[in-house]
Amino acid sequence: MEVAYYNLAGGINQSLTKTELGIDTKKVNWADSENIEIYQNRGIVKQKGNTLFLDIGEEITGLAEISAYDVNKMVITTISGKIYIYDENHSKKILVDKTLKGIKPVFLNFLNGILMMTEADGLFYIKNNSKYEVVECDLKDLSDNTVTGASMAVYKGRVWVAKDATIYYSALGSYNDFKTEKDAGYINEFHTDTGSVTALKPYKDYLAVYKKDSVYLLTGTSPDDFAIVLFANKGAVGAGSIVNVENKQYFLSNGIFALEQVGELNQIQLGSEISSKIKQEFSSFGKLEGTLCIHYEKRSQMWYFFPYADDNYLHTVWINDYINKAWYKRVIPQDIVTACIYNGLVYTADNKGKIYKEDFGTTFNGEAVKFMWKSPFLALSNPHHRKMIDEFYFLLDTEQDNDFNFSVYKDYDSEYSDDIEKIYSIHQDHLIWADDMMSDDLPCHWTPDNASVPVWSVNKDTMEKAEISEANYAVQLCVSGEDVTQSCAIIGLQFREVYNDD
């Protein structure tokens, strides 16, 4: 008997038992992984690392992107209250003439500049000009106190700010006029709901207004026709974990859910939970209000920086691949405190003031990208019989280097590994382009063992045999690596000559 698996793109699945997890032969779910991602929608590959982008010199509290006329710059705030604008095109770091009192900044792009607020600083606007002038917005609450620590959004040409149970909105096209009658104003304790607003986020033709246990939809273009309706009894923990992706708006509650527009009438409905496969992990998280989600559109991914109860930093990132509907895990060695999208890429910042460009290079700024992947326990057709596996092969993609450790867990025992060996397949039977240093005029040559030049393979796929000893009811495959030079790109698993041992 022969059993083969050519779709390894199931991602981590914590919702099934050990015996259930390996039943699906069409798509392989993962028992666990670290720094492994889906490769070409079918295989698995080691994730890329990160590299140092900028060193500010003190702990960073916030990152954001400011854009004007297709030119993007990075906004950086620090623990001492400094605000920097980094212009990458001119390699310039400009200090803004404003010192923050708070350490929890929120950002909102409006017109060509950016609005900011912290838990101790009122709303202000930074103009995107040569001097990055600061304009105080002077937003006061109903008791004439400065509004701080609020949620913000832009909707229908206005700035919307929510604090406690009140939503304030600016005059049309203005970021600092919250007083003009019949243009600016506020909405207070709508639907007799006195609960605090946790987040504001535009979605389609609506402004989604989230509270802890409910979400409302606001419509209209002027104070005369603004209207709010209760949509669902499912709320959001905070604004940092809400993202718009394609036709949906994802938000974090006791799981991750979505508002989605469906049907010919474009009706809004509440989608099903997308975090059910990793729901077990939620018991390890701390306060979910601190969760940060960023949409990495280039890779069709959402990166969730969940705060773990036993970790003061954001070392572990849960990545949702929404094309493959799969989850995988990224573990970053640096002490990450925040992240943002800048120029379409993911950037993170640590507690030492260093900013990193993520999903780049083969190391974490010089440190090895430690990786691990565990298959489910594979019963290979019949879970009630012990089976001898005479031949097992990894199908490897030789456009990538493969150098990893292999081990096997047997018969649903996840503690003890067996059959430990090393799989090594690097630049085998590759051709390299000729250059001016070659002694002849041939266009290409076989690569020497020590070559580090670009290569292409004669055969894209290669088979590497590995040993699985003894007769077993089920086997779990483990692939791992801890050295800088180790990596993997696996596109299939083949079990040949499988016999029932009865």
Predicted regions and their residues:
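Extended hydrophobic/Leu-rich segments
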Residues: 94-96, 115, 137-142, 420-426, ...
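Short strand-coil-strand connectors
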Residues: 80, 88, 119-120, 164, ...
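Hydrophobic or amphipathic alpha-helical targeting/insertion segments
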Residues: 105-139
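Generic beta-strand hydrophobic packing signal
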Residues: 63, 123-124, 134-135, 152, ...
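Beta-sheet repeat architectures centered on beta-propellers
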Residues: 1-90, 100-109, 233-248, 253-255, ...
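Beta-propeller and closely related beta-pinwheel folds
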Residues: 50-60, 93, 97-102, 133-291, ...
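A short, charged
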Residues: 113-115, 120-125, 146-159, 293-295, ...
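Short beta-strand/turn micro-motifs composed of small residues
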Residues: 118, 163, 211, 393-396, ...
